[in-house]
Amino acid sequence: GINTKIQLSEEEKIMRRRINEEYMLNGVILENPETITIQKGIRIGRDTVIESNVKILGDTIIGENCLIGMNSRIEDSKIADDVKILSSVIEKAIVEKGADVGPFSRLRPKAHLKERVHIGNFVEVKNAVVGEG
């Protein structure tokens, strides 16, 4: 059993490694996988690159050929193919194909980025649809 916080931490490392190895065997590229937290059951497409210190949580789907940059957090969101997210926080949002986000941006609940939209540095979007302008 687990009786101390140290033992809990060691067990979490073991589980994180097992989960991350499963994603890598299915074609996801994890840079420094020991720093990446992905909850079990999240769908991630082939050839998506996930950099260091990323957390992917909840009811999240990430498409193929994406880049999830270091220090990003994605929760309960839908990310289409060919999306680039750099050091940003995405929560309960939709990002369509070919869009790019950040660095240092935040998509809050009900943010929806249409295809090929660019959201730059330090931008926050909530409850809005952003399309070609």
Would you name each region that the model predicts?
Residues I29-G133:
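Structural signal for interior beta-strand "rungs" in well-ordered beta-sheet cores
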Residues G1-G45:
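Conserved alpha/beta core of the MobA/IspD/sugar-nucleotide pyrophosphorylase nucleotidyltransferase superfamily
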